[in-house]
């Protein structure tokens, strides 16, 4: 229980600090550093506990593509041929996506599951993920963040895998 509290406070503190610093320094360095900092939350966890194993890598990658497709459906409806992200912003988007997944669906999910079971892990990590974005997104967008968290968390639980959510989240962030 103590580990869960520490992970939750650490994840939210890092996410909110990144959002606040971004307002004064600009998005590219802040997002990249924030993503790397969030990745540090996973230190000390066994890869298997985080859903990171090398077995069945192809299905996990394909699952990530499917997750990305689901997350991008609303954006695809309104897409108007927007250009690709410039490389510095793309690198930052990758860093924050990987960092958020390691933190929210990796360490936080594992701590919630150990303390309260899989349903609490899916719901709790999704709610905390949405709450972590309150400083960086408008209120209505938080519902989309919550929905994305539920999709990513459900995959994490059902497949016992974090590769799919990392791939899906990264592709969605690169496309949005």
Segments (PLM) and residue ranges:
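Generic transmembrane alpha-helix motif of multi-pass integral membrane proteins
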Residues: 36-39, 95, 107, 150-160
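Structural signal for the C-terminal ends of transmembrane alpha-helices
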Residues: 14-17, 39-48, 73-77, 155-157
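Aromatic-anchored segments of alpha-helical transmembrane domains
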Residues: 8-19, 68-77, 126-134, 170-176
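Hydrophobic alpha-helical transmembrane segments
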Residues: 4-5, 60-65, 90, 119-124, ...
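Function-critical hydrophobic alpha-helical transmembrane segments in multi-pass membrane proteins
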Residues: 76-134
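Alpha-helical transmembrane segments in multi-pass membrane proteins
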Residues: 1-43
């Amino acid at each position: 229980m103590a580990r869960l509290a520490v992970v939750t406070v650490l994840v939210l503190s890092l996410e909110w600090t990144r959002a606040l610093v971004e307002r004064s320094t600009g998005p590219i360095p802040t997002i990249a550093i924030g993503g790397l900092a969030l990745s540090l939350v996973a230190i000390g966890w066994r890869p298997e506990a985080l859903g990171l194993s090398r077995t069945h890598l192809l299905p996990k990658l394909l699952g990530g593509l499917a997750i990305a497709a689901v997350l991008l459906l609303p954006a695809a409806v309104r897409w108007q041929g927007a250009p690709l992200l410039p490389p510095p912003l793309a690198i930052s988007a990758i860093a924050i996506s990987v960092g958020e997944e390691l933190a929210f669906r990796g360490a936080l999910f594992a701590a919630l599951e150990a303390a309260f079971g899989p349903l609490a892990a899916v719901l709790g990590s999704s709610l905390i993920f949405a709450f972590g974005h309150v400083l960086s997104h408008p209120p209505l967008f938080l519902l989309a963040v919550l929905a994305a968290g539920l999709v990513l968390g459900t995959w994490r639980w059902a497949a016992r895998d974090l590769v799919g959510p990392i791939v899906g989240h990264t592709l969605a962030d690169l496309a949005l």
